[in-house]
Amino acid sequence: MDSEVAALVIDNGSGMCKAGFAGDDAPRAVFPSIVGRPRHQGIMVGMGQKDSYVGDEAQSKRGILTLRYPIEHGIVTNWDDMEKIWHHTFYNELRVAPEEHPVLLTEAPMNPKSNREKMTQIMFETFNVPAFYVSIQAVLSLYSSGRTTGIVLDSGDGVTHVVPIYAGFSLPHAILRIDLAGRDLTDYLMKILSERGYSFSTTAEREIVRDIKEKLCYVALDFEQEMQTAAQSSSIEKSYELPDGQVITIGNERFRAPEALFHPSVLGLESAGIDQTTYNSIMKCDVDVRKELYGNIVMSGGTTMFPGIAERMQKEITALAPSSMKVKIIAPPERKYSVWIGGSILASLTTFQQMWISKQEYDESGPSIVHHKCF
């Protein structure tokens, strides 16, 4: 597709925004979904201080800013900040004029109706896009794995969903949501590191802990066994250098933090773990489709990137499933971006071109048209 008129694909996650052009095989821009505002009054004249910073710039100046995430648990909670992120995406990251490109946005499953309308309204009225579409994240992940039937475990920074899809349609009655994802694991890691005597408290320090989590954490195949190993030897200990040069050592925290995905009770949450929730979702589906779902469990999102997670999932689901059932976990290496990749595939299909909501249709029907045209 010609990038003159290529559609723009934007996957707005709670933690990272992924944006780029339809037809590309990876997003051009990936930056934190953060808006930062200075904590102090600027005193140096001519420094060109801004009243807000977005994405990587907010991240690099985090020491003097208060950082806010406008998307919580996958759902937009602050529209002014969200608009800043979109503005930054179009003009600074992709350097395009939004009025010249169709835009495909992604949304969390079970996104409130009013949110879809607000999204649609901002795109047409603030950014004047010529055409627009909104697609469910988990469905796009399945597309990117080359399937039309499967059950997607999508776990990002803000929310985890289990979405069964049959022949391209999600089965809404069986979609399950867990309000436990990457950000909660980061917070939990902050807590268990403080028990070791390392204190992290500010929004900026949380970002350091997120980095520790991404670099050093893994999922144990057998938690109890791993705890014993950790107690008896220092083989799993790793060191991490903080920005100020101080070096900290991290041991069983490496696998204790991600264990919360399988046992949310350690966070004081009543919900079932990702393994049990996946099983529960399959059991809510028609008995005839279950076999295909068990054989196509697709992982997507950054929080499924922990080493060992697919093996552990395989073990747990196999234990829950009927004994003769073939259980297959698909964990593509690019799963951090599979939602975006699915969007890129969808928006470049010739059959998709008549699916867009055009500016004209929007002007005639208003924001509610999104419910009739986007499934």
Curated annotation (Swiss-Prot):
GO cellular component annotations of the record: actin cortical patch; actin cytoskeleton; actin filament; actin filament bundle; cellular bud neck contractile ring; chromatin; Ino80 complex; NuA4 histone acetyltransferase complex
Protein's recorded name: Actin
Keywords from the UniProt entry: Acetylation, ATP-binding, Cytoplasm, Cytoskeleton, Hydrolase, Isopeptide bond, Nucleotide-binding, Ubl conjugation
Predominant place of localization: cytoplasm
GO biological process terms on file: ascospore wall assembly; chromatin remodeling; DNA repair; DNA-templated transcription; endocytosis; establishment of cell polarity; mitotic actomyosin contractile ring contraction; protein secretion
Coiled-coil segments on the chain, per record: none
Molecular functions per Gene Ontology: ATP binding; ATP hydrolysis activity; identical protein binding; structural constituent of cytoskeleton
Native organism: Saccharomyces cerevisiae (strain ATCC 204508 / S288c) (Baker's yeast)
Covalent cross-link Glycyl lysine isopeptide (Lys-Gly) (interchain with G-Cter in ubiquitin) as placed by the record, residue numbers: K191
Catalyzed reactions: ATP + H2O = ADP + phosphate + H(+)
Enzyme nomenclature, EC number: 3.6.4.-
Subunit structure: Polymerization of globular actin (G-actin) leads to a structural filament (F-actin) in the form of a two-stranded helix. Treatments with Lantrunculin A, the microbial peptide Chondramide or the microbial metabolite Chivazole F inhibit actin polymerization. Each actin can bind to 4 others. Interacts with YIH1 (via C-terminus); this interaction occurs in a GCN1-independent manner. Component of the INO80 complex. Component of the SWR1 complex. Component of the NuA4 complex.
Residues with the N-acetylmethionine modification: M1
Function, in words: Actins are highly conserved proteins that are involved in various types of cell motility and are ubiquitously expressed in all eukaryotic cells.
Outcome (variant: Y143F): In strain: CBS 1907
Pfam families: Actin
Alphabetical list of InterPro entries matching this protein: Actin, Actin/actin-like_CS, Actin_CS, ATPase_NBD
